């Protein structure tokens, strides 16, 4: 991390001597620091505590000012563990917010919240840095072009297409496949994407962060031999980090992405896994700062904190940031304040369903709950729009009939309804797809399906052309031709058994 020029600079040394405080209280990750009268630091300024603990181990803790308490005291939140700190230790006000390295030097590297490399590959060039707190682009700078961002995932491209330069949310409870879906999107988009990507791991499992790093090295997205040719920068603040780090690591990743957009004028992909942990960390910090909790125990500033982050993730006339964010849904309740606040900022929502995951349909994307502002005839075209609407109507009718089927059975339905149910079950299975990143689990090679192929496949199912084929032929296949080939194989297998 580089906040200011080196401390050997005499001007900086004088200012540091002037702006020296003392720790007056420590409660977990929160420090109260007393400063001389008239030398109070600003909100969001970085404070650094250096010294040695009782065992002689070196201490270097960076904090961020959150409150001015009066009586020349400030309250700050630590970005790393506070073990070894004690009252009376010197604290230096750095005079600026946290600043992190940006630009080409960040590619192929893993950083923590302070912008320090944590991959044991040596130091990073810190000549170009940027503060993590800044205002969103002015309204007049924003870009309003509308175009589809193809992912190669059938259910997403057909029913809830993503916007290039937009914000996308992947909503789901624990264990329904958010991280697998985000890794597949990285695989499909980041590899084919000409620009750069930034991945922010916010409060998730360290193992998943390690898996992602290894996978990116294998696929060539990170080039170990020549890091400058890498296409991604990784910023991690995992589950074991203090709440201050988890609350700010998203801003560190966003700051790196903003530099590529504004200075290099590139199209950037920003992946955040998981935005709920950002809210959760904010809630922890809010309680530590003594604020009165709001609904369900969340911080009273929830909407403001979310808005401050999300408004910076946008596309300008210089370049774009396309953001894909995983959102954990506590107890599968989409009305919980954290996911509900996130909904308002998104162009497309991909909702993952536990019911579909239980059926073994992966990706477990709920075709009726997932939405997109892009699914309009003037944007996607009449053919795409009509096909998507017919698929949704068929699945909605099947959903309505499920209670009748459960009580009376299929035989009691009309001929038309039985046909609808048969097609809906084929559609449901055809919405599943083998993923590249899940090959070890499914045993099937991953498939990328173009948008035109996706539309053709669903149109053929809706037209009744494949009414005679068994529904299992449509499960975990790529395009419709693979489904017909699978049906032929199944028929041959059944004949051989006889």
Swiss-Prot record:
Record bears the keyword Plastid: yes
Key word Phosphoprotein present: yes
Known role: Produces ATP from ADP in the presence of a proton gradient across the membrane. The catalytic sites are hosted primarily by the beta subunits.
Protein localization: Plastid, Chloroplast thylakoid membrane
Family: Belongs to the ATPase alpha/beta chains family.
Modified residues (Phosphoserine): 13
Catalytic activity: ATP + H2O + 4 H(+)(in) = ADP + phosphate + 5 H(+)(out)
Location, primary (coarse class): plastid
PROSITE patterns: ATPASE_ALPHA_BETA
Membrane topology: Peripheral membrane protein
Name under which the protein is recorded: ATP synthase subunit beta, chloroplastic
Lineage of source species: Eukaryota, Viridiplantae, Streptophyta, Embryophyta, Tracheophyta
Top EC class for this record: translocase
Gene Ontology molecular function terms on file: ATP binding; ATP hydrolysis activity; proton-transporting ATP synthase activity, rotational mechanism
Residues recorded as bearing Phosphothreonine in the entry: 6
InterPro entries in the record: AAA+_ATPase, ATP-synt_VA_C, ATP_synth_F1_bsu, ATPase_a/bsu_AS, ATPase_alpha/beta_chains, ATPase_F1/V1/A1_a/bsu_N, ATPase_F1/V1/A1_a/bsu_N_sf, ATPase_F1/V1/A1_a/bsu_nucl-bd
Binding site for ATP: 172-179
Assembly mode: F-type ATPases have 2 components, CF(1) - the catalytic core - and CF(0) - the membrane proton channel. CF(1) has five subunits: alpha(3), beta(3), gamma(1), delta(1), epsilon(1). CF(0) has four main subunits: a(1), b(1), b'(1) and c(9-12).
GO cellular component entries: chloroplast thylakoid membrane; mitochondrion; proton-transporting ATP synthase complex
């Amino acid at each position: 991390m580089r906040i200011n020029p080196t401390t050997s600079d005499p001007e900086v040394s004088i200012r540091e001597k002037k702006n020296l405080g003392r720790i007056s209280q420590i409660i977990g990750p929160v420090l109260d620091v007393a400063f001389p009268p008239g030398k109070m630091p600003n909100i969001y300024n970085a404070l650094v505590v250096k010294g040695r603990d009782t065992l002689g181990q070196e201490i270097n803790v960076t904090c961020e000012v959150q409150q001015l308490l009066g009586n020349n005291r400030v309250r700050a939140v630590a970005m790393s563990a506070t073990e070894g700190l004690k009252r009376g230790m010197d604290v230096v006000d750095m005079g600026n917010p946290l600043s992190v390295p940006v630009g080409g030097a960040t590619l192929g590297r893993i950083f923590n919240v302070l912008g320090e490399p944590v991959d044991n590959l040596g130091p990073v060039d810190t000549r170009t840095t940027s503060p993590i707190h800044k205002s969103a682009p002015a309204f007049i700078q924003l870009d309003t072009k509308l175009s589809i961002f193809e992912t190669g995932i059938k259910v997403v491209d057909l029913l809830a297409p993503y916007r290039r330069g937009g914000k996308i949310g992947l909503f789901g409870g624990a264990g329904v496949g958010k991280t697998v879906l985000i890794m597949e999107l990285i695989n499909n988009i980041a590899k084919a994407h000409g620009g750069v990507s930034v991945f922010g791991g916010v409060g998730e499992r360290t193992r998943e962060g390690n898996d992602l790093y290894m996978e990116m090295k294998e696929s060539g997205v990170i080039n170990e031999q020549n890091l400058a040719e890498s296409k991604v920068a990784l910023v991690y603040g995992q589950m074991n980090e203090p709440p201050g780090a988890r609350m700010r690591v998203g801003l560190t990743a966003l700051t790196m992405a903003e530099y590529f957009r504004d200075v290099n004028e590139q199209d950037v992909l920003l992946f955040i896994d998981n935005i709920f942990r950002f809210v959760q960390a904010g809630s922890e910090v809010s309680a530590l700062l003594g604020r009165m909790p709001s609904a369900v125990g969340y911080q009273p500033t929830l909407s403001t904190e979310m808005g401050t982050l999300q408004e910076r993730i946008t596309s300008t006339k210089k370049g774009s940031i396309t953001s894909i964010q995983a959102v954990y849904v506590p107890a599968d309740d989409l009305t919980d304040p954290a996911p509900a606040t996130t909904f308002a900022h998104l162009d497309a929502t991909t909702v993952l369903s536990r019911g579909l995951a239980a059926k073994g349909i992966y990706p477990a994307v709920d075709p009726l709950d997932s939405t997109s502002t892009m699914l309009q005839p003037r944007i996607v075209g009449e053919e795409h729009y009509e096909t998507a609407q017919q698929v949704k109507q068929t699945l909605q009718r099947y959903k309505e009939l499920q209670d009748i089927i459960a009580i009376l059975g299929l035989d009691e339905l009309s001929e038309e309804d039985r046909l609808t149910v048969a097609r809906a079950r084929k559609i449901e299975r055809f919405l599943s797809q083998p993923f590249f990143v899940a090959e070890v689990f499914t045993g099937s090679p991953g498939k990328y399906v173009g948008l035109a192929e996706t539309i053709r496949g669903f149109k053929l199912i809706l037209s009744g052309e494949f009414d005679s084929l068994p529904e299992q032929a449509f499960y975990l296949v790529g395009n419709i031709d693979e489904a017909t080939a699978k049906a032929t194989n199944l028929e041959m297998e059944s004949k051989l058994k006889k």
